[in-house]
Amino acid sequence: MPIITLPDGNQRQFDNTTSIMEIAADIGPGLAKACIAGRVDGQLVDACDPIEKDANIAIITAKDDQGLEILRHSCAHLLGHAIKQLYPNAKMAIGPTIENGFYYDIDLDVTINDDELAKIAKRMNELVKTNYTVVKEKVSVEEAKALFKERGESYKLEILEGIHPDDRPGLYHHEEYIDMCRGPHVPVMKFCQYFKLMKVSGAYWRGNSDNKMLQRIYGTAWADKKQLNAYLKRLEEAAKRDHRKIGKQLDLYHMQEEAPGMVFWHSNGWTIYRELEKYVREQTEAYDYQEVKAPQILDRALWEKSGHWGKYKDNMFCTSSENRDYAIKPMNCPGHLQIFNQGLKSYRDLPLRMAEFGSCHRNEPSGSLHGLMRVRAFTQDDAHIFCTEEQILDEVSACIQMVFECYKTFGFDDIAVKLSTRPDQRVGDDATWDKAEAALANALTTNNINYGVLPGEGAFYGPKIEFTLYDCLGRGWQCGTIQLDFSMPGRLDASFVGEDNERHTPVMIHRAILGSLERFIGILTEEYAGVYPTWLSPKQVVVMNITDKQSAFVDEVVNKLKKSGIRAISDLRNEKIGFKIREHTLKRVPYLLVIGDQEVEAGEVAVRTRKGDDLGKFKVDDFAAYIKEEIITRR
């Protein structure tokens, strides 16, 4: 006779074994119709799973985040069901959920184009309308192997090879289609009606390029039509803001096959890059950092000693010379430790703050590369602080303050903070990790920062604070990090002389604000839709004549603005002024100056903004002062 405790503390007693669905029905028919799954003593379960003893339970509906995750996972099974009906020879690989949706990897001889995708979606809709019941079955590993061998599902068999023989995999029956999963899943298919198949791409089995290339079908799914339409609308807006599209329109950069994942910066894009670099440099100087520069290529022995070789060698570009192995740096910390190690350090030298615009390379899979957002060559606004344990709180607090100040400059005020704790693969003992995690948690609490915890997501050498920016479309971008490291300084022989005249190992704080300059420019481009604030705009002013008679004065104005440090250009083409204004507005130039005979006579410029506002006429020096103030204050 299990006693069930609900989230509000109310209890219900059942005569026999019960289930989440029976409990929902006991509460009310409306809840039973909405029930997707449940939690029993904190564990996710299917709505049909038996509950045989006293338990604390919660009923999950599509309104819950976990409910949305479950229905998306069930949509992946629905996709598999439709594919097997349409293409019986297809072999199904994996179908997990992802942010906002799901995908399924399929081994299929037929190339899935737009027409095939529409056919699959149509069959999925037909299956949903039948509202069939999903039946769960727990079997032995051997029974599962026999089933999938009979069905010719070689990828499922390979997955089963990695499952412990004593486990009992879950099989979910979608009528004649059977899929294998931990679950939970929706009880009936009506919950999966608000979906859309989005695209098809290639994906190597298990992400290994030595394996067969499969076809990956992506989809999105939501609790109701309103949510689905809102998401599709956001995608439309995101497509308009795509930094790759805007980058081409504004002539910022390009990428090409001869250098995959590496950016060719054009003059306009490089101007933005240098302005970001200038801004970060001002901040590091204000916070008393020393700027340094370490080599890009270091001996393999150093990477082995630091621990990076064992963790990252597959993602490192390597080379050799004169019988020595080298690697291009994927990160900057070992180089900064070598600088710290030059000369004897005293406790009086600490904290020592070291910053670098570090050029890094990582051998990311080619399929994961995406414009500026995922590259192989990038520059980190990296810094490392060497300090004593007693200085950790003050130094981490200063880093937190610096991060928030920088993000505010760019207009980001919706920032999520997470504390990432020890991963399974790590260096250092548990006592050291306990101390490091507690130190970061203390700094966050002291600074009144609300934060969540990401178990197991820390770096291999220490826990970290992660800062995720949310843009105007509600998308999250993880950028800044503050990582505490008690391990690497000791591994690389860093030490200082303490007040007791003994040698001690410093604590190392790894800190980045933008993350990588390339990716942050991509984020800003999409956030601003290319309408950068004046201080970041590649061209800040365009000066245009109405007729050839004003050309000399246009040149005079441009030269005067340039001498004031303003990025100004002229447009002396023999085109109508309206045409010029439209063209430079599309190029997102912040200020458009028009000069006719009256302006020449008065020594003035007529000022318009890219928004179409007419600011009236200014003396040239007055306009220069006006825009300079905007640039200096970074408004």
From Swiss-Prot:
According to the UniProt record, what class of enzyme is this? ligase
Instruction: Note the Pfam families from the entry.
Output: HGTP_anticodon, TGS, tRNA-synt_2b, tRNA_SAD
A GO molecular function held by the record = threonine-tRNA ligase activity
Region Catalytic, as annotated, extends over 242-533
Q: How is the cofactor bound?
A: Binds 1 zinc ion per subunit.
Q: Does the keyword RNA-binding apply?
A: yes
* Cleaved signal peptide residues: none
This enzyme catalyses:
tRNA(Thr) + L-threonine + ATP = L-threonyl-tRNA(Thr) + AMP + diphosphate + H(+)
Q: Which PROSITE patterns match?
A: AA_TRNA_LIGASE_II, TGS
Primary place of residence? cytoplasm
Positions of Zn(2+) binding: C333, H384, H510
Gene3D superfamilies reported in the protein's UniProt record:
3.10.20.30, 3.30.54.20, Anticodon-binding domain (3.40.50.800), Bira Bifunctional Protein, Domain 2 (3.30.930.10), Threonyl-trna Synthetase, Chain A, domain 2 (3.30.980.10)
Q: Where is the TGS domain?
A: 1-61
Which cofactor(s) does the record list? Zn(2+)
Catalytic activity, EC: 6.1.1.3
Report which superkingdom the organism of origin falls in: Bacteria
Q: Keyword annotations for this protein?
A: Aminoacyl-tRNA synthetase, ATP-binding, Cytoplasm, Ligase, Metal-binding, Nucleotide-binding, Protein biosynthesis, RNA-binding, tRNA-binding, Zinc
Q: Which GO terms describe its cellular component?
A: cytosol
Q: Which GO terms describe its biological process?
A: threonyl-tRNA aminoacylation
Q: Where in the cell is it found?
A: Cytoplasm
Subunit text: Homodimer.
| Summary of the function given for this chain in its UniProt record | Catalyzes the attachment of threonine to tRNA(Thr) in a two-step reaction: L-threonine is first activated by ATP to form Thr-AMP and then transferred to the acceptor end of tRNA(Thr). Also edits incorrectly charged L-seryl-tRNA(Thr).
The record's similarity note reads: Belongs to the class-II aminoacyl-tRNA synthetase family.
Q: What is this protein called?
A: Threonine--tRNA ligase
Q: Species name for this entry? A: Psychromonas ingrahamii (strain DSM 17664 / CCUG 51855 / 37)
